[in-house]
Design a protein with these regions (language model features):
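Acidic/His- and Gly-rich active-site-bordering loop/insert found
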Residues: 2-104, 109, 113-116, 120-121
Length: 122
C-alpha cells in the first residue's frame, strides 16, 4: 500500500474519527476507569471489521483489535485517559468546563483516536 493510499484510507474516516475524539474529550475518564472511551473505541474498530477483544491483557479498559493474519505484525498503543485539574472548554484560553475537574490536557483523546486512524490507514 502506498503512502497516498494510506492517507486516503484515513481521510475516508476523518469525520467519524473527529467525532470519536470529541466524544472522548467531552466525557473525560481517569486511567483504569475509561469505560466509555474504551467501549466507543472498541465499537468503532469492530464496525470497521476488526476482531476486538475487550478487557485485554487483564486490564478492564484495554482493547486488542486484530485485522488479518500472518506477518508482519504491527502494534499500536493508544491512550484515552484524562488527568485531574485539566478540565477545559474547546478554546485556546484557559476556561475549565468544571473548575479543577477532569480533562484531556495531554491530548490522550487524540492519541487513542490517532492510533485508530493509523490502523485504518494500514
Amino acid at each position: 500500500m502506498t503512502q497516498k493510499a494510506c492517507c486516503a484510507a484515513i481521510d475516508a474516516h476523518a469525520r467519524e474519527l473527529i467525532e470519536l475524539s470529541k466524544k472522548i474529550w467531552e466525557r473525560p475518564e481517569m486511567g483504569w476507569t475509561e469505560k466509555n472511551a474504551s467501549a466507543w473505541t472498541a465499537d468503532y474498530l469492530k464496525k470497521q471489521g476488526f476482531a476486538v477483544e475487550r478487557g485485554a491483557y487483564g486490564m478492564p479498559t484495554a482493547i486488542r483489535a486484530v485485522w488479518g493474519k500472518g506477518a508482519p505484525v504491527v502494534g499500536f498503543c493508544g491512550e484515552y485517559d484524562c488527568l485531574p485539574g485539566l478540565s477545559q472548554k474547546v478554546c485556546p484560553d484557559f476556561e475549565p468546563v468544571v473548575p479543577s475537574g477532569l480533562g484531556h490536557g495531554c491530548g490522550h483523546n487524540l492519541l487513542g483516536v490517532g492510533c485508530v486512524a493509523a490502523c485504518l490507514g494500514l
